[in-house]
From Swiss-Prot:
This is Large ribosomal subunit protein uL6. Residues 170-179 have a biased composition (Basic residues). PROSITE patterns: RIBOSOMAL_L6_1 (PS00525). Transmembrane segments: none annotated. Residues 154-169 have a biased composition (Basic and acidic residues). GO terms for molecular function: rRNA binding; structural constituent of ribosome. GO terms for cellular component: cytosolic large ribosomal subunit. This protein binds to the 23S rRNA, and is important in its secondary structure. It is located near the subunit interface in the base of the L7/L12 stalk, and near the tRNA binding site of the peptidyltransferase center. Residues 154-179 are annotated as: Disordered. Part of the 50S ribosomal subunit. It comes from Oleidesulfovibrio alaskensis (strain ATCC BAA-1058 / DSM 17464 / G20). Disulfide bonds: none annotated. Keywords: Ribonucleoprotein, Ribosomal protein, RNA-binding, rRNA-binding.
Amino acid sequence: MSRIGKQPIPVPSGVEVKLGADVVEVKGPKGSLTTPVSPLLKYEIQDGSVVITRVEETKKASAQHGLRRTLLANCIEGVSKGFSKVLEVNGVGYKVAVKGNNIELALGFSHPVVIELPKGIEAAAAGNKLTISGFDKQLVGEVAANIRRVRPPEPYKGKGVKYEHEQIRRKAGKSGGKK
């Protein structure tokens, strides 16, 4: 039995869960999300929580059990509380600015890099920190990863874009002596 999958998902007040034939729709104060349903699982709403059980005991059903439960729990948490990721921009002259629906990054290139935010994602810049927030956990993570990919942190000085609590493996510079 999947230890994650067998846990019921509590549905907070203000969140509505609709079980469909091929998708589960979740509506809340922050927005609306859908997640696909696996035919190997059975979804039920009991006592203000969603319970997912397996139809058959196979290895694939066991894998789907934990996955689908976590995806649905992320949808429920997203439409009620939302998710956010914080990025840090380190480097001399490196700047980040939010202009409307775009993020403008000055990261040492000859031109500013402009990244357009998808629908449902918000950004806020404060100093060298950039906060990406939204109700879809996968989309928040994808946008943050795309921003980090523009200039990932380098191991010698640590310059670049990194996640807030990310540890950069540093390398020693040249250690050759003079002749």
